[in-house]
């Protein structure tokens, strides 16, 4: 493949450097949910952790494949990562809703539960992005599509 923003090397880098976070949260959520039950502790912690992991994933992916978006600034990448993290939290809740509706599961326990999950996912994403700004590398130090 070529050297474009979505070439094979970029895909491999995303898999190696970014995918592990969300995958780890999903695996921990499945195991901890089975061991301890999802409510009242595992589910909230995992939604927050999911927000952290998704913000990490989207920030790394947008940095690695930055050519796809032009030449975004670090703020641009952070804003894109935040928006995509919020979208991921929203679509996760849609999945829970439709699972309850069509598969007869009882994952969502009401509006309060859904709003809590959205708030925790968003908060996890915000915390990651702020922490990455404080302790992370500067824009010039980021390995953007080398």
Give, region by region, the residue ranges found by the protein language model.
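Short aromatic-rich membrane-water interface segments that cap or initiate transmembrane helices
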Residues: 109-117
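Bulky hydrophobic segments
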Residues: 1-110, 122-146
């Amino acid at each position: 493949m070529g050297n474009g923003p979505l070439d094979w090397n970029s895909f491999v880098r995303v898999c190696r450097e970014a995918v592990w976070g969300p995958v780890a949260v999903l695996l921990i959520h499945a195991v901890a949910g089975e061991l301890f039950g999802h409510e009242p502790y595992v589910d909230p912690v995992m939604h927050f952790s999911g927000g952290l992991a998704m913000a990490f994933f989207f920030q790394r992916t947008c940095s690695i494949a930055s050519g796809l978006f032009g030449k975004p600034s670090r703020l641009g990448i952070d804003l894109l990562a935040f928006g995509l993290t919020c979208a991921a939290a929203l679509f996760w809740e849609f999945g829970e809703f439709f699972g309850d509706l069509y598969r007869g599961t009882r994952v969502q326990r009401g509006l309060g539960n859904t709003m809590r999950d959205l708030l925790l996912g968003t908060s996890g994403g915000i915390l990651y992005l702020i922490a990455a700004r404080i302790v992370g590398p500067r824009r010039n130090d980021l390995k953007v599509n080398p």
